[in-house]
Amino acid sequence: LKALLLTQGMHGMISQVEGLAKALNLNYKHQEIKLKKFWKFIPPFLTPPSMSVLETQFIFDSKIVISCGRKSVIPSLALKKKYKDKIFTIHIQDPKVSVDKFDLIICPEHDNLVGQNVIKTIGAIHYLSEKEISKEKNYLQVDRETKKVITLVLGGPNKYYDFSDKEMDFLFNKIKTIFTRDKYKLVVIPSYRTPP
């Protein structure tokens, strides 16, 4: 079964749509969504469900659409409007439109969405499987007998936040001040966006 994955191209969104597609054992292709300038600033509930608001068009040949993020709502709705019951639409996160516009919505509990087609999660879904985690279980093997473990999951710069050397120094000095070296072990887990 083929699926089209729609996101804005951010890793956090890609990991969610790919995770669901892999869990459902779907063949999938990813389409990054870019709205035309004017429509970037308009909320989904005010944007017409039309492919004409997209910067680039794409070929659609799937039975399932999995979307994530605000900008992917519109092309998903446009495809549903065109193909009706011939396709099944799934949106991950709060779409900021009526839940009835999708066949299924998967969102974190804290989004407080309610509906017969809403599945609530604790945290975000992702593409790591139990098999992959089990295979890498020794990757972060830590001697817990002697020290308490502090784990820092470190992201990276985005359009709202820049990881400067000054900010990194501040962060690590703060950690060093709070957690003395002799009692704690720091485990830093970088993301693909973490600067070198």
Language-model-derived ranges and their functions:
Residues D100-S164:
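A nucleotide-sugar donor-handling region in carbohydrate enzymes
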Residues R181-P196:
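Catalytic donor nucleotide-activated moiety binding site of glycosyltransferases and closely related
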